[in-house]
UniProtKB/Swiss-Prot annotation:
<dbReference type="GO" id="GO:0015031">
    <property type="term" value="P:protein transport"/>
</dbReference>
<keyword id="KW-0963">Cytoplasm</keyword>
<dbReference type="GO" id="GO:0051082">
    <property type="term" value="F:unfolded protein binding"/>
</dbReference>
<comment type="subunit">
    <text>Homotetramer, a dimer of dimers. One homotetramer interacts with 1 SecA dimer.</text>
</comment>
<comment type="similarity">
    <text>Belongs to the SecB family.</text>
</comment>
<keyword id="KW-0653">Protein transport</keyword>
<dbReference type="GO" id="GO:0051262">
    <property type="term" value="P:protein tetramerization"/>
</dbReference>
<dbReference type="GO" id="GO:0005737">
    <property type="term" value="C:cytoplasm"/>
</dbReference>
<dbReference type="Pfam" id="PF02556">
    <property type="entry name" value="SecB"/>
</dbReference>
<keyword id="KW-0811">Translocation</keyword>
<dbReference type="InterPro" id="IPR035958">
    <property type="entry name" value="SecB-like_sf"/>
</dbReference>
<comment type="function">
    <text>One of the proteins required for the normal export of preproteins out of the cell cytoplasm. It is a molecular chaperone that binds to a subset of precursor proteins, maintaining them in a translocation-competent state. It also specifically binds to its receptor SecA.</text>
</comment>
<keyword id="KW-0813">Transport</keyword>
<dbReference type="InterPro" id="IPR003708">
    <property type="entry name" value="SecB"/>
</dbReference>
<keyword id="KW-0143">Chaperone</keyword>
<dbReference type="GO" id="GO:0006457">
    <property type="term" value="P:protein folding"/>
</dbReference>
<protein>
    <recommendedName>
        <fullName>Protein-export protein SecB</fullName>
    </recommendedName>
</protein>
Length: 163
């Protein structure tokens, strides 16, 4: 049996590194809000508009331990043929990840990191829609684990087709 504690790994110097996930920075990379029919689109409505929301997550290494995780949220409100508003947010975070086994990196980058970014991105979208003259759009919590599993299944299906 090893003296090494569960989850600890050796760094390049042979020293033990405790598993850690730190947020070094959070930032708005892109934010847009369009209300093409304003001010007419701001009038009271008999029924709620249809709101379509798209979510995407990407991650890129910056160094051996630092990663840029980007959460993209797009929301479009439509009433019949009229576009009430269209908003897009690209919100990123720089994460330092150390002492995590390689097999756990993708789930950490595509599930846990966006889960940490989401509340901030959600608030920015809510503020943008409110400042645009509409009720704040409070996006429901997102199941990033399900998104990740779906993404992995799609990639496996693509690689199976290529084989």
């Amino acid at each position: 049996m090893s003296d090494k504690a569960a989850g600890e790994t050796k760094n390049g110097n042979g020293a033990t590194t405790e598993p850690s996930l730190n947020i070094l920075a959070q930032y708005v990379k892109d934010l847009s809000f369009e209300s093409p029919g304003a001010p007419l689109s701001l009038r009271p409505r008999e029924k709620a508009p249809s709101i379509n929301i798209n979510v995407n997550v990407n991650a890129n290494p910056l160094s051996e331990t630092d990663f840029d995780v980007v959460l993209t949220l797009e929301a479009k409100a439509v009433d019949g043929k009229d576009i009430l508003f269209n908003t897009e947010l690209v919100y990123g975070g720089v994460f330092r990840i150390q002492g995590i086994p390689q097999e756990h990196m993708l789930p950490l980058l595509f599930i846990e990191c966006p889960r940490l970014l989401f509340p901030f991105a959600r608030q920015i979208i809510a503020d943008a829609t409110r400042n645009g003259g509409y009720p704040p759009l409070m996006i429901d919590p997102i199941d990033f684990a399900q998104m990740f599993q779906q993404r992995m299944a799609e990639e496996q299906a693509k690689s199976a087709v290529k084989s």
